[in-house]
């Protein structure tokens, strides 16, 4: 996660102690732990045609005003209503008239200073650019058949194959054949093709065979001005404003609050009908700015961690870090996740910089989600950008994942064992034929669990296994952050030929998709996308980020390989053992001579597989390698950059040749 804005690093006049004199609502707290906690839901608006009730938790406020507007932007409030302080620091009021179609904001007075308009921390509908909350008829936001929408079945997290995408990347290019380019609705269009008459869009996803689409941040964010969408500005969206509203820039009309809501639901519904689950990228670890954030304008200081000198902690690297351990921030995060599940039928969550959050909060989120549906996935980045202002042993870091059952993290060990150090793009590793990364790759192959043949003292980043179960590890070689795969190969192997790049691209993803754990693919890798060598394209133009769908034709061989590789994994449970003991019993590394060669055996019909024994070998040398195998008659299904489950010939052992810069898979 990266964004490039400059942020205020000082909290300003707000301190932990808040004293308000000469006020009928004077409150004095010596620590954030003493702030009252609102009971029940954090709902801030309840509408009926006869009256609308408003609520705002702001325990340190001297006064709170409700501002009513006719429009989502511009103009002045047509009515101002003074709110009354109720229980547990919650201010309330009721407006006894029909407010449908109106907009509202709150303004909080603290230490004799009005903080400025905020839609609250929990708005569910907003006007353009999210400055004001909207009062809408929610029944009009449900597409036809929404009540019968169901998430596709999923037996185990090991069965997941995640496809990470950005809305604009996936559909905005002129070659996509998609009408609603860069919009939620792009993922509802069937029958779209490129110039070679090959499927694009949602049909492409079905053809590829992925099970989950991971959407980069899709809740309301700051960096795109929704009033200037014709200027085609781009951003990943890791600068959150309103956490519980879809972003308007991906809708066909950001001025109408119901449009973004309905179109987001249409997208989810279409993906579900196509057999694909939907994962949201959520960014609870920081806000776009601090002093003007909805959190800060509502309860100054409370939602952020501070250093001892009162300045903002910055574990996110973006100017602030949220305080997930505080009761109301924890409550907010739990309710937010549950809201996206209930209202939008979301099937999973990827937590940006999850290492900023505390373990207890993440476990409470997992427990709350389990009560709805335990197959809803939760995974995240098991690290932070800088050291958070919280005890390290209580943070949701990768090394602590054993204390978070049912939550997964990305394996940078496998990624960098294959590609090289992510921050040193010219340095290669296993794929580049650089020796020394083999044990890190093996660590990823077993799913980051304890395995008798994996020596963690030779693993790049972890001196001990951190996963209790292989399904706590996400395996990948590329994502939106850093270089995409082909750019990484070019940077670390400047002399590589186009043919070698293709071979190594296939080899890399074969490691990912035959490893235990949860495989993850960056959108466009299946057609060998590039981003012109840019490793932080968070605000680069479409010319850099968009998938050129002509590549599906020119790189058809690569797409076919990915498709067949995915099908191979889905068809054979040996590659999807969700249990650590099963992995230790059935996965055995074979002895090899020299470096840059890794081989393993999935034996004894692992996980009930129809294949009795499976041999998998990865050779990153430029020359063929000899591999000793158990004697038997094997059918080759992957060799020299080609996959065909019908067979590519047979081998009998006790020795087999593994072609250079490629994978070999065979079974008996």
Segments and roles (model prediction):
Residues 56, 106, 165, 215, ...:
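Conserved, mostly hydrophobic/aromatic
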């Amino acid at each position: 996660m990266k964004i490039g804005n400059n942020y205020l690093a000082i909290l300003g006049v707000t301190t932990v102690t808040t004293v308000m004199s000469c006020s009928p609502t004077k409150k004095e707290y010596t620590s954030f732990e003493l702030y009252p906690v609102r009971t029940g839901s954090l709902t801030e608006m309840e509408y009926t045609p006869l009256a609308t009730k408003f609520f705002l938790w702001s325990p340190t406020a001297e006064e709170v005003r409700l501002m009513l507007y006719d429009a989502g932007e511009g103009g002045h409030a047509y009515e101002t209503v003074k709110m009354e302080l109720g229980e547990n620091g919650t201010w309330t009021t009721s407006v006894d008239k029909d407010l449908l179609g109106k907009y509202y904001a709150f303004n909080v007075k603290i230490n004799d200073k009005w903080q400025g308009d905020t839609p609250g921390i929990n708005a569910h509908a907003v006007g353009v650019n999210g400055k004001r909350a909207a009062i809408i008829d929610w029944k009009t936001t449900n597409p036809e058949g929404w009540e019968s929408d169901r998430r596709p079945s999923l037996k185990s997290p090991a069965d997941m194959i995640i496809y990470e995408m950005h809305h604009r990347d996936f559909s905005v290019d002129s070659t996509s054949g998609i009408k609603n380019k860069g919009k939620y609705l792009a993922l509802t269009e069937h029958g779209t093709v490129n110039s070679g008459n090959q499927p694009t869009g949602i049909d492409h996803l079905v053809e590829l065979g992925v099970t989950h689409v991971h959407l980069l941040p899709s809740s309301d964010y700051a960096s795109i001005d929704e009033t200037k969408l014709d200027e085609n500005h781009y951003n990943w969206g890791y600068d959150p404003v309103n956490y519980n509203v879809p972003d308007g820039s991906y809708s066909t009309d950001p001025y109408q609050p119901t449009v973004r809501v309905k179109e987001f639901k249409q997208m989810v519904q279409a993906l579900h009908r196509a057999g694909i689950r939907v994962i949201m990228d959520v960014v609870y670890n920081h806000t776009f700015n601090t002093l003007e954030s909805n959190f800060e304008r509502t309860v100054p200081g409370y939602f952020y961690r501070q250093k001892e000198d009162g300045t903002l902690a910055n574990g996110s690297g973006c100017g602030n870090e949220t305080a997930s351990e505080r009761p109301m921030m924890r409550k907010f995060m739990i309710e937010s996740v549950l809201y996206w599940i209930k209202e939008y039928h979301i099937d999973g969550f990827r937590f940006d910089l999850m290492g900023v959050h505390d373990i207890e909060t993440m476990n409470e989120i997992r427990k709350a989600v389990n009560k709805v549906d335990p197959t809803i996935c939760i995974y995240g980045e098991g690290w932070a950008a800088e050291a958070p202002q919280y005890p390290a042993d209580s943070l949701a870091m990768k090394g602590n994942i054993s204390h978070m059952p049912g939550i997964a993290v990305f394996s940078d060990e496998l990624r960098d064992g294959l590609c090289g150090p992510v921050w040193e793009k010219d340095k290669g590793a296993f794929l580049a034929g650089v020796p020394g990364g083999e044990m890190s790759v093996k660590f990823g192959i077993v799913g980051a669990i304890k395995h008798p043949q994996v020596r963690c003292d030779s693993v790049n980043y972890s001196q001990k296994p951190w996963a209790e179960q292989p399904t706590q590890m996400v395996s990948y070689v590329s994502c939106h952050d850093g270089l995409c795969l082909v750019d990484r190969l070019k940077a670390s192997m400047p002399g590589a030929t186009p043919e070698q790049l293709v071979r190594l691209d296939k080899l890399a993803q074969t490691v990912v998709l035959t490893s235990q754990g949860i495989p993850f693919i960056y959108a466009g890798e299946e057609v060998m996308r590039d981003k012109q060598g840019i490793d932080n394209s968070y605000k680069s133009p479409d010319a850099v980020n968009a998938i050129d769908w002509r590549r599906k034709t020119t790189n058809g061989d690569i797409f076919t390989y990915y498709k067949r590789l995915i099908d191979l994994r889905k068809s054979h449970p040996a590659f999807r053992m969700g249990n650590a003991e099963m992995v230790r019993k059935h996965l055995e590394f074979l002895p090899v001579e020299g470096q840059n060669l890794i081989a393993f055996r999935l034996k004894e019909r692992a996980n009930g597989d129809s294949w009795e024994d499976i041999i998998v070998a990865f050779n990153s040398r430029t020359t063929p390698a000899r591999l000793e195998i158990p004697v038997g008659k094997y059918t080759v299904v992957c060799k020299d950059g080609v996959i065909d489950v019908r067979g590519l010939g047979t081998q009998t052992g006790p020795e087999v040749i593994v072609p250079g810069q490629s994978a070999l898979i065979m079974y008996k």
